[in-house]
Amino acid sequence: MCAMDRRERALISQLHFTHSLGEAISFLKYPVCVRFEDGSFIKENNCFEKLIRSSFNSCDEWFDSLKLECKLQLSRAEIESCSSIYGVNCNNDILLNNVLWSVIIESVITPCGYFFIWRFIWVANDNLSSFVVSKYSNELIVPSDEYVGIEPYLIGFSHHYSSAKMNITVSKSKKKTMKLFKRYGFSSRDLWLDEMIRTEKILPLYAKVKEILGR
């Protein structure tokens, strides 16, 4: 068999990432969509489809229907999220379908390019809006030192494969993993992954592993 070229590997890598991203946002109870750096919308959850996209056939069609000022504001927010220390930009009082929303845009850089996660929080729900803005101002955007050396294992690879990629011993990989799980109260990797996917903390970690594997 012929070895895949870099373009083919990048395409497969992007497909895996977008699939994981789609699964992660499907758990959320507020509208979320994902746009790639080329301006195309690649994912949305059910809440977005029902509350934001509504009668339009696609996210792109919905976005094209917005007023120019609104489109520029949201596109500019993507750019500003890239330069933000937390990778997040928040726009308040965006009027969509006669409802005011806070739109929180988070940028995630991967070897394939930038992905932008758009979160829509109903302004009338002050408690939820404040919680989400606070969460994405303080939550982990880049994996902490606690993950260094065991990143591949944390997202699903075996200790043997992970330790070989990270150039550490299997024993050290297991000890560091046990220490991390014990500190945060996880009895298994399954429970760890369940929590990470539901809270979307898996996304920056996944991007980090993609970077490691691409070296």
UniProtKB/Swiss-Prot annotation:
Give the NCBIfam families listed for this entry: PRK13719.1-2
* Function text: This protein is essential for positively regulating the expression of transfer genes that are involved in the conjugal transfer of DNA between bacterial cells.
Which InterPro entries does the entry mention? TraJ
Keyword Cytoplasm part of the UniProt annotation: yes
Its taxonomic path starts at: Bacteria, Pseudomonadati, Pseudomonadota, Gammaproteobacteria, Enterobacterales
Q: Which parts form a coiled-coil structure per UniProt?
A: none
Q: Does the keyword Repeat apply?
A: no
Organism this protein belongs to: Escherichia coli
Keywords, ordered alphabetically: Activator, Conjugation, Cytoplasm, Plasmid, Transcription, Transcription regulation
Instruction: Tell me where it resides.
Output: Cytoplasm
| Listed Gene3D superfamilies | PAS domain
Q: Which GO terms describe its cellular component?
A: cytoplasm
Name the UniProt record assigns to this protein: Protein TraJ
